[in-house]
């Protein structure tokens, strides 16, 4: 029996991830990158590929993009209603503005943001609606960008977009992944 099959609740999944999964990425060469302050981290765009859930379990390392695929696998196996969301700043030209992926699931009429990769918000957060959850994450992402991005400006908030996206193909590089997630359903809700 796979370890993932022994996990019986979202809370247990979060605890498992807390105990076993580290933020970072795996390069196409199989090398694990976990030190964001290392000069090697600067190469992520060229060397990173998006892992599927099984690969994250094996490597024990993943970006939010990867970790959501592990979460997706568990939520599918356990018959939850959920969506995966990608948010990013749609600005032209090179920039250091962050993107984020996350999972929202529905249970007993409530919506829950399941978060492991966004360190300061690690946990399961309850909301009354899907749009409320997405807006909350967007607000936190914007605050994070203002604190951590050299290029972030207040007017960038207007360019922070959310996309619901389906499971990506295996072994996508960064550009392929970005094309996949931004081809998803653009969330045009007036509250977003």
Residue ranges of predicted features:
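A structural boundary/capping signal
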Residues: 1-192
């Amino acid at each position: 029996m796979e370890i993932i099959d022994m996990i019986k609740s979202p809370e247990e999944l979060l605890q498992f991830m807390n105990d076993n999964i580290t933020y970072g990425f795996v390069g196409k060469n199989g090398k694990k990158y976990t030190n964001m302050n290392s000069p090697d981290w600067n190469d992520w765009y060229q060397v990173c590929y998006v892992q599927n859930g099984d690969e994250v379990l094996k490597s024990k390392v993943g970006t939010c993009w990867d970790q959501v695929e592990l979460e997706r696998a568990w939520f599918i196996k356990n018959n939850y209603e959920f969506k995966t969301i990608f948010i990013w700043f749609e600005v032209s030209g090179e920039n250091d503005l962050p993107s984020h992926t996350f999972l929202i699931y529905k249970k007993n009429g409530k919506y829950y943001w399941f978060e492991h990769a966004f360190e300061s918000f690690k946990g399961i957060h309850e909301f009354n609606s899907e749009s409320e959850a997405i807006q909350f994450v967007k607000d936190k992402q914007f605050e994070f960008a203002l604190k951590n991005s050299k290029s972030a400006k207040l007017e960038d908030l207007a360019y922070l977009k959310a996309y619901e996206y389906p499971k990506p193909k295996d072994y996508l590089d960064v550009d392929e992944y970005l094309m996949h997630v931004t081809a998803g359903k653009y969330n045009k809700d007036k509250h977003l």
